[in-house]
Amino acid sequence: MTRARRRVVAIGLDMLAVPFTEQLMDRGSLPALAGLRETGTRFLLDHGTAQATGLAWEHVATGRSPNHGGRPSAVEFDPATYQVRQLGTDLDPAFERVDRRTVVFDVPYLDLRRADRVAGVVGWGAHDPGVEPAAQPPELLEEFAARVGPYPASPWLYATPWPTASRCEAMADALADALDRRTDAARWLMTERLPDWDLFFAVSGEVHSAIEGLWHGVDADHPLHHHPSACAAGRGLGKVLSALDRFVAVLTDAAKAVGADVVAFSMGGMGPNRSDVPSMVLLPELLHRHAFGQPLLRLPNAWSKRPSSIPDPLRGRGRALAGGSWIPPETRTGRVRAAAVRQIPPGWRRGLRRSAGSEVDHEGPAEMSLRWQPASRYQPTWAQMRAFALPSFYDGRVRINLMHRERRGVVSLGQYEAVLDEIESVVRACRDPRTGEPVVATVDRPGLADPLGLSPSNADMVLTWRGFAAAFDHPDLGLIGPVPFRRTGGHTGRHGVAYVVSSSLQPGDGGVRSSFDVVPTIIDLLGCDPPDDVCGTSLLTP
C-alpha cells in the first residue's frame, strides 16, 4: 500500500563508538549530533552476529541480511582453485524497488549500475565502498569530479599511523579536511544539482577510518594508550568527530528547510581492535606449523626475545622492517606477475586484471586484492593441509579441506567433526605471553549442519579473540610473534545507534532494536511499504 509522499534525509554515520561519541555530546563538543538526540528518538541498534561479516553497508544498501540473500563474508574462497578474493556487492539496491525519488552520495555497496531510479554519486571516498565509482545520470560523474575533485584523503582511509604522533596528526587533519569537502559536496548535490528528491541519503566514512587508526588515543585500557602517539591520536579523533558534526549540521539544516524527517544512524559500534594480528598473522602461522611442523613466518630476533612486548616497527631494527618485510614472501608466480604488472601503463592495468580474473566485468561486483594480507601468503600450501586460515578482516576463520567440496580435499566427511575438535584444541591451547591468558573467547562452527553445503564465503570455524594478543604461545608449536599491531580500533562496540527525528515518533529513548530495522524505517517514513525482500521491521512499529 502506498501512502502520502513524505521527504526523508538519511545520514550514515559510518561508524560510531557510541558511548565515546555520546560522552562528547554531553560535554557540548558535538552540538548537531546532540540536537538529534534531544529532539528525536534514540534507538540503540543490535547488529547481532551479522556485525562480524563486515558487510553492514551491504545490509543497508540492499536491505538484506546474511540469512536472506546476503553472505557471511566479503572474502570469497574458490574450492576448485583455492584462490581467495574480496568481492563487492552483486545485489540490487533496496531503494531501486521503492516508488520514491532517491538521491545518494557515497553510500557503500549501493551499485548505481543496477539502479535506474536512484540518482547520485557513489565510490568517491567511502570506507570500503564495495562498488566501482559511478553516477546516475552517468554524466554526473565527470561533472562531480570537475566540481569537487578527487577524494583528498585516500592514503589515510586504511592507514595505521600509531607508531608516530606526526602520522596520527596528519591522518586526522586529512580526514577532517576530507569530511568538510564531503559536506560541501553533499550540500551541492541535495540543494542545487539534484534537489528533486524524496530521500536524500549521504554517508560519511571518515570517522570509521579515524577510529581504526586513532582509537588508542581515547581508550585507557588499550595496550598502546601510553605510546607517545596516543595524545595526538586522541586529539585527532576528536577533530574528525567535530568535522562529522558539521556534516550532520548542514544536512539537518537542509532537512528542516524542506520539512524532511531525519534518520542518522550507525549500524554497529566501534571499539578496540582485537582481531588484526591474531586473524591475519598468528592463526595462519599456527595452522601451518600444526600441519608441517615448521614455521613460515620469520621474525627478527629482537622481537622474539621479548615475547610479552608489542613491537614498534619504527624502533631499533624494526625501522628496517616497517614495510612488512617480515611477512611471509609471495610465491614466485605472484612476484613475477606483480613485477610484470608494474611495467604496464596504469591505464592498461585494469584490462589485464580483468582478463586474469582479479576483477570482474563491468556488470559484476567490484573486486579487491587480498595479496597484502599475511594469511594469503600461506595459500600455496592450503591444498596440502587439513585446515587452513582464510584471510579475514575480523574474526579468525578456518576452512576445512573437505573431500567432495574442495577440489583437492583430504578430510572425509566422517572425519569432519574430529578435525574441527583437533583444530579447536590447538587454538585453545595458545596463551598470550603478555598476559598469560587464553587467546580464544568463543568458537563457532557454521558448517556443522551441512558441511558439504557450506558457501564459498563461509568458514567451518569462526573464532573470536580475547584481549590484545600480539603473540601466541603454544606448548608444542612454540612462540608465534610478537608482531606489531595494525589497526588500534575495530568493530567491537556492543551497539550501533539511530537518531530519528519525525512527527511519527515521540522524542526520547526507543530502547534496543535490530540494526536491520533501519532500512524499513526509512522506507516507512517515505510513506511506502518495504519490498518483500527487505529484512527488519520499521522503528515506527512498537
Protein language model regions, located:
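Active-site-proximal N-terminal segment of extracellular/periplasmic enzymes that hydrolyze or transfer
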Residues: 1-41, 534
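Beta-sheet entry/capping signal
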Residues: 7-9, 42, 101-103, 187-188, ...
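Secreted, luminal/periplasmic, and some membrane-associated catalytic domains
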Residues: 13, 43-46, 51-55, 74-97, ...
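Short, structured active-site-proximal loop/turn typified by the sulfatase FGly-forming signature C/S-X-P-X-R
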Residues: 22-60, 67, 103-105
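Non-catalytic, well-ordered alpha-helical segments in soluble enzyme domains
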Residues: 34, 95-96, 337, 414-433, ...
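Extended, H/D-rich, highly charged conserved domains that either
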Residues: 111, 127-194, 206, 211-219, ...
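Active-site His/acidic residue clusters
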Residues: 191-239, 277, 394-396, 400-414
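Low-complexity, glycine/alanine/valine/leucine- and proline-rich hydrophobic stretches
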Residues: 464-519
